[in-house]
Amino acid sequence: MTLHVLCVGGEDHALRIPFLAALRSRGFRVSAAGTGAALPFSNSGIDYHRYDFNRFGARVADRLAVGQLSQLVRGIRPDVVQTFDTKPNLLAPLAVRGAIPIVRTINGMGWVFSSAQLKALAFRPAYLALQRLAACWTSATVFQNKEDGDFFRRYRLLGNSPAVLIGSSGIDVDAFDTARAQAPSTAQLRRELGLGDDEVVMTVSRLTVQKGIPTLLDAAAIVREARPRVRFVLVGPRESEGPFAVDQALIDRYAPHVIALGARSDVPALLGIANVFAFPTEYREGIPRVLLEAGLAGVPIVATRMPGCGDVVVENCNGHLVPPRDPRALAAAILDLLQHPARAKNMGQRSIALVRREFDLNVVADRYADLYRRLILTGRRSEDPAALSRDIHEDRRVSQHGGKSP
């Protein structure tokens, strides 16, 4: 019998295609449901079903999404439903209501639990209530970092479902290496972007306040006082980010020393021109994929001390961790790596080893496949958490090495 997994996500669900392909190679039938374009899935031979919800609110749209997902599940009858991202994690359990085993992956807690803004604080009680409700129909909850698992336990958001720790959604190491091998030379990319011989600090993220872009811009000004020939390259969408987007006028104020390229599909190639990768997020991340990409590219990393970032970056081992919303600390860490290129290169090499060992897609896919099979074999919505899950307190991070090179 071929087991069928339906994976439900949001607008950037195409990022899960390598994960779905890895499940398919392990004998699963896979389908996907998301709010983005169907073409990437059809090109990969994956059945795709589009549904609608509003990432920025809209209760009416959410109710419609629950109805659409319920109809979809009844129509295709998967054996397991897997969800990623905040709203799908809430909406899909309400749509399925225990009819089929459902696994939700908490890939970060996001802005609501990272910001002290009144709007974020106001959302928190509703978020907690919805998570408790969703837990009633959840078979297992996967966390990408220990901090989020601890949070769900503290606020009793798991119900009777077991908690499982699986670091990240995985990164296809072979595909990443192939993309870099087939990319234009770094010299060509530098010419195309007009960078010359300048040092490059790169950021790949949505260009939002919550991702720390204003902090990065302030840090860029500080860095340039010490090293005038440094360029900051921002890669990622802005226009699609609604009320959270950074004002374009703010970015323009720092031109030409700050360049915003928009969303790009050639991130593996672009990372080849970076001397330092900066990730100033104020967000509660799961395991940020961009940190895995930067690590696999061998670029030394400066990230904020937020959940998820410390699972990839170990202070003075493969990069630096700094407080969020602190441009001076961010600038100092960037300058340290630029001023000590040999040490920075060694840090990058440690990141390569860490990502290949801990976050390879094959490692992650094996763990999910094992979880799905055990859920289905029980014939129940969930089983004894002690029998099903690996303890959420299992910490497979590089910090087990005591801050030494992995």
Model-assigned labels for residue ranges:
Residues G272-G286, V299:
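Acidic donor-binding loop of glycosyltransferase active sites
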Residues H49, L128, R132-P184, L195, ...:
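Donor nucleotide-sugar binding/catalytic pocket of nucleotide-sugar-dependent glycosyltransferases
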Residues A33-A38, I171, V204, R231-A245:
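Glycosyltransferase donor-sugar binding loop
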Residues V314-N316, H320-P327, D336-A342:
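Conserved acidic donor-binding segment of nucleotide-sugar-dependent glycosyltransferases
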Residues T83-N89, I106:
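Short His-centered aromatic/hydrophobic patch
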Residues L291, P300-A303, V313:
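Short hydrophobic beta-strand element within catalytic cores of glycosyltransferases
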Residues L195-K211, L217-A220, V233:
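Conserved donor-binding/catalytic core segment of Leloir-type glycosyltransferases
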Residues A245-R264:
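Nucleotide-activated donor-binding/catalytic signature segment of Leloir-type glycosyltransferases, i.e.
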